[in-house]
Amino acid sequence: YLRSNLMSSLIDTYIFNLQQNNILNSYFEINTVFNSSPDNTFNDVPNQNVVLGFITSANLTTQDIRKSDQNIDIYYVKSLINQLINDTQLEPIIKPGFHQNYSFSIFKNNEIVGHFGQLSTELQNNFEIENEVFLGEIYVNKLNLNELKLINYKPLSQYPFIKFDLSFSVPVEFSAHL
Protein backbone atom coordinates (compact mmCIF):
# COMPACT_ATOMS: atom_id res chain seq x y z
CA TYR A 1 0.00 0.00 0.00
CA LEU A 2 1.06 3.59 -0.51
CA ARG A 3 1.64 5.43 2.76
CA SER A 4 0.67 9.06 3.03
CA ASN A 5 2.69 9.59 6.23
CA LEU A 6 5.15 7.81 8.52
CA MET A 7 3.53 8.84 11.79
CA SER A 8 0.95 6.06 11.98
CA SER A 9 3.62 3.36 11.60
CA LEU A 10 5.89 5.14 14.08
CA ILE A 11 3.06 5.23 16.64
CA ASP A 12 2.47 1.50 16.05
CA THR A 13 6.19 0.83 16.56
CA TYR A 14 6.25 2.94 19.72
CA ILE A 15 3.21 1.16 21.19
CA PHE A 16 4.53 -2.30 20.27
CA ASN A 17 7.85 -1.61 21.99
CA LEU A 18 6.05 -0.11 24.98
CA GLN A 19 4.01 -3.32 25.32
CA GLN A 20 7.22 -5.38 25.10
CA ASN A 21 8.72 -3.34 27.98
CA ASN A 22 11.43 -2.01 25.69
CA ILE A 23 12.80 0.98 27.55
CA LEU A 24 14.39 2.58 24.49
CA ASN A 25 11.60 4.87 23.37
CA SER A 26 12.89 7.03 20.53
CA TYR A 27 12.53 5.84 16.95
CA PHE A 28 12.95 7.18 13.45
CA GLU A 29 12.27 6.03 9.91
CA ILE A 30 13.33 7.36 6.53
CA ASN A 31 11.01 6.24 3.76
CA THR A 32 8.96 7.30 0.78
CA VAL A 33 5.47 8.70 1.27
CA PHE A 34 2.90 9.48 -1.39
CA ASN A 35 0.25 12.15 -1.85
CA SER A 36 -2.51 12.66 -4.38
CA SER A 37 -0.91 15.56 -6.23
CA PRO A 38 0.59 14.60 -9.59
CA ASP A 39 4.26 13.78 -9.84
CA ASN A 40 6.49 16.44 -11.41
CA THR A 41 7.76 14.00 -14.06
CA PHE A 42 4.84 11.62 -14.64
CA ASN A 43 1.28 12.95 -14.46
CA ASP A 44 -0.39 9.58 -13.87
CA VAL A 45 1.81 8.66 -10.88
CA PRO A 46 1.23 9.96 -7.33
CA ASN A 47 3.77 12.43 -6.00
CA GLN A 48 6.55 10.78 -3.98
CA ASN A 49 8.62 12.36 -1.21
CA VAL A 50 11.42 11.03 0.96
CA VAL A 51 10.52 11.75 4.57
CA LEU A 52 12.34 11.47 7.88
CA GLY A 53 9.81 10.55 10.57
CA PHE A 54 10.59 10.51 14.28
CA ILE A 55 8.87 9.77 17.57
CA THR A 56 10.13 10.14 21.12
CA SER A 57 8.75 10.02 24.62
CA ALA A 58 8.94 12.99 26.98
CA ASN A 59 10.70 10.64 29.40
CA LEU A 60 13.91 9.38 27.81
CA THR A 61 15.32 6.34 29.54
CA THR A 62 18.71 4.77 29.14
CA GLN A 63 20.15 1.31 29.61
CA ASP A 64 23.22 2.84 31.20
CA ILE A 65 22.58 2.66 34.96
CA ARG A 66 25.19 5.37 35.51
CA LYS A 67 22.87 7.93 33.89
CA SER A 68 19.44 9.06 35.02
CA ASP A 69 16.33 9.45 32.91
CA GLN A 70 15.90 12.70 31.02
CA ASN A 71 12.60 14.58 30.79
CA ILE A 72 12.17 16.63 27.63
CA ASP A 73 9.57 19.01 26.27
CA ILE A 74 8.54 20.41 22.88
CA TYR A 75 11.31 23.02 23.07
CA TYR A 76 13.94 20.30 23.37
CA VAL A 77 12.57 18.67 20.19
CA LYS A 78 12.67 22.10 18.51
CA SER A 79 16.33 22.48 19.51
CA LEU A 80 17.15 19.07 17.99
CA ILE A 81 15.57 20.13 14.70
CA ASN A 82 17.53 23.40 14.80
CA GLN A 83 20.73 21.44 15.40
CA LEU A 84 20.07 19.44 12.23
CA ILE A 85 18.66 22.15 9.95
CA ASN A 86 19.99 25.73 9.90
CA ASP A 87 17.74 28.79 9.97
CA THR A 88 14.31 27.27 10.45
CA GLN A 89 11.17 29.14 11.41
CA LEU A 90 8.17 27.63 13.15
CA GLU A 91 4.50 28.44 12.80
CA PRO A 92 1.75 26.94 14.96
CA ILE A 93 -0.62 24.61 13.11
CA ILE A 94 -3.76 22.67 13.90
CA LYS A 95 -3.30 19.15 12.57
CA PRO A 96 -5.34 16.01 13.34
CA GLY A 97 -3.58 13.77 15.84
CA PHE A 98 -1.50 16.59 17.29
CA HIS A 99 -2.03 18.58 20.48
CA GLN A 100 -3.68 21.86 19.44
CA ASN A 101 -1.24 24.02 21.43
CA TYR A 102 1.98 22.11 20.72
CA SER A 103 2.18 21.49 16.98
CA PHE A 104 4.25 23.41 14.47
CA SER A 105 5.11 23.62 10.79
CA ILE A 106 8.82 23.86 10.02
CA PHE A 107 9.78 26.46 7.40
CA LYS A 108 13.09 27.04 5.68
CA ASN A 109 13.44 29.82 3.09
CA ASN A 110 9.66 30.40 3.30
CA GLU A 111 8.94 26.81 2.23
CA ILE A 112 7.42 24.18 4.49
CA VAL A 113 9.96 21.41 5.11
CA GLY A 114 8.13 19.47 7.81
CA HIS A 115 5.99 19.51 10.90
CA PHE A 116 6.21 18.22 14.45
CA GLY A 117 4.35 18.35 17.70
CA GLN A 118 2.98 16.56 20.71
CA LEU A 119 0.59 13.65 20.24
CA SER A 120 -2.95 14.73 21.10
CA THR A 121 -4.26 13.94 24.56
CA GLU A 122 -7.16 12.03 23.00
CA LEU A 123 -4.84 9.67 21.08
CA GLN A 124 -2.52 9.38 24.07
CA ASN A 125 -5.46 8.21 26.22
CA ASN A 126 -6.80 6.00 23.42
CA PHE A 127 -3.46 4.16 23.11
CA GLU A 128 -2.99 4.15 26.92
CA ILE A 129 0.33 5.98 26.74
CA GLU A 130 1.35 7.46 30.09
CA ASN A 131 4.10 9.87 28.99
CA GLU A 132 3.75 12.71 26.53
CA VAL A 133 4.93 11.75 23.04
CA PHE A 134 6.49 14.02 20.41
CA LEU A 135 6.54 13.13 16.74
CA GLY A 136 7.08 14.71 13.38
CA GLU A 137 8.15 14.48 9.78
CA ILE A 138 10.86 16.30 7.84
CA TYR A 139 10.58 16.35 4.04
CA VAL A 140 14.09 15.42 2.96
CA ASN A 141 13.39 16.23 -0.73
CA LYS A 142 12.78 19.87 0.18
CA LEU A 143 16.13 20.32 1.91
CA ASN A 144 19.45 21.22 0.38
CA LEU A 145 21.47 18.36 1.85
CA ASN A 146 24.69 20.36 1.44
CA GLU A 147 23.35 22.93 3.92
CA LEU A 148 22.65 20.41 6.69
CA LYS A 149 24.89 20.76 9.68
CA LEU A 150 27.69 18.24 9.83
CA ILE A 151 27.30 16.15 12.94
CA ASN A 152 30.33 14.11 13.88
CA TYR A 153 29.43 10.53 14.52
CA LYS A 154 31.08 8.83 17.47
CA PRO A 155 31.25 5.08 16.84
CA LEU A 156 29.86 2.80 19.48
CA SER A 157 32.33 0.78 21.46
CA GLN A 158 33.05 -2.64 20.03
CA TYR A 159 32.79 -4.01 23.55
CA PRO A 160 29.33 -4.44 25.05
CA PHE A 161 28.35 -2.33 28.02
CA ILE A 162 28.58 -4.28 31.29
CA LYS A 163 25.88 -3.45 33.81
CA PHE A 164 27.40 -5.35 36.73
CA ASP A 165 30.78 -6.89 37.30
CA LEU A 166 30.60 -9.07 40.39
CA SER A 167 33.59 -10.66 42.09
CA PHE A 168 33.51 -13.04 45.03
CA SER A 169 36.17 -14.28 47.40
CA VAL A 170 35.53 -17.92 48.12
CA PRO A 171 37.44 -19.88 50.76
CA VAL A 172 39.54 -22.75 49.41
CA GLU A 173 37.63 -25.24 51.57
CA PHE A 174 34.30 -24.21 49.99
CA SER A 175 32.78 -27.13 48.12
CA ALA A 176 30.01 -27.09 45.57
CA HIS A 177 27.84 -30.17 45.87
CA LEU A 178 26.69 -31.09 42.39
Stretches found by the model and what they are:
Residues 1-178:
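Extended beta-strand-rich architecture
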